[in-house]
Amino acid sequence: MLKGHKVNLAIVEKTDLPVLKDWGNDVDFVGEFEPFSQVALSDLEKQYDARGDTQWFLVQKKNGTSIGYMGHFKSKDCMAIGYMLVGKERGKGYGSEAVQIMVDYLFLHKDIVRIQAETHPDNKASQRILEKAGFSKEGIIRRSFFSRGAYRDTAMYSILRDEWKQPRILPLGHAARKKAP
């Protein structure tokens, strides 16, 4: 478990998949900025079994209540992250801390020089989360995906290892820092 001040990140176990399915099938949880389609538990189980380097985490309040999820996956020679929280828990700093924990974790444990994240250009809350964690906006990827009847743009954000410098939440002793290539 990755421990923060407000939230912890717990590895998703197969027994957690029904919760992810329920969230993924809830249009209010997915929100207005993400693609929405119904997900079957059997499909989630197949993704879970074939995840490879991808890791999924539950975002949990300190009392153990799961309030969202996030994950990381390899994208070319870097890591990409994604995250979602239940609506009533947004705007309380939980997402910001979860992203910062993930950034610390990835730079402490993975031999990478870059972490990236995509968000909708109108999703100002998600952009603030990324900027608080040290990400910089790189630009807009025009018409990058089809969702809800239209092609949508994506805002690309990234943080480089030399911009990160040191962990903000996880302790330095959490892991030996690997040198980037």
What is the predicted function of each stretch?
Residues 1-27, 59-181:
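Acyl-donor (CoA/ACP) binding surface of acyl/acetyltransferases
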Residues 28-47:
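Conserved GNAT-fold acetyl-CoA-binding loop/helix
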Residues 38-43, 51-52, 86-89, 174:
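Juxtamembrane/interface motifs at transmembrane-helix termini
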Residues 47-58, 68:
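A short helix-loop-beta-strand connector motif used in the catalytic cores of GNAT acetyltransferases and
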